[in-house]
Swiss-Prot record:
HAMAP family: RbfA (MF_00003). The lineage of its organism: Bacteria, Bacillati, Bacillota, Tissierellia, Tissierellales. Gene3D superfamilies: 3.30.300.20. One of several proteins that assist in the late maturation steps of the functional core of the 30S ribosomal subunit. Associates with free 30S ribosomal subunits (but not with 30S subunits that are part of 70S ribosomes or polysomes). Required for efficient processing of 16S rRNA. May interact with the 5'-terminal helix region of 16S rRNA. Pfam families: RBFA. Disulfide bonds: none annotated. One of its GO terms (biological process) is maturation of SSU-rRNA. PROSITE patterns: RBFA (PS01319). Monomer. Binds 30S ribosomal subunits, but not 50S ribosomal subunits or 70S ribosomes. This is Ribosome-binding factor A. Transmembrane segments: none annotated. Its main location: cytoplasm.
Length: 121
């Protein structure tokens, strides 16, 4: 499959899912203000789309959000089918994106090292 097409489809799916989370999903487990789609990776054969989401909150909040999104897979696939020009809509796989939390942790470590060095001088 053409890599440009796969990237374009990934981008379009990301837009549709993001919009659906904000405007259409009614599941109380999904806090629209604290959930964002960070990336979508579609396989070259377009059969699977891994959707990475960032959730602000504790592990229980993340678990509930994943449950809500998995429950809404059928609806989200329908939205993708209506808005993205595809013969077959890929299976959706939702995963928590931990990169933002990891980067914040690293940033905090760097700040604490900087403060320790500053206090020693």
């Amino acid at each position: 499959m053409n890599i440009k097409r796969v990237r374009r489809i990934s981008s379009e799916i990301k837009k549709v899912i993001s919009s659906s989370i904000i405007n259409s999903l009614k599941d109380p487990r999904i806090d629209k203000l604290n959930v964002s789609v960070t990336e979508v990776k579609v396989t070259n054969d377009l059969s699977f789309a891994t959707v990475y989401i960032a959730v602000i909150g504790d592990d229980e909040k993340k678990k509930q959000t994943l449950e809500g999104l998995n429950k809404a897979k059928g609806f989200l696939k329908k939205q993708i089918g209506e808005n993205v020009d595809l013969r077959h809509v890929p299976q959706l796989i939702f995963k928590i994106d931990e990169t933002s939390e990891q980067s914040m942790h690293i940033e905090n470590l760097i700040k604490s090292i900087h403060e320790e060095n500053h206090n020693e001088n």
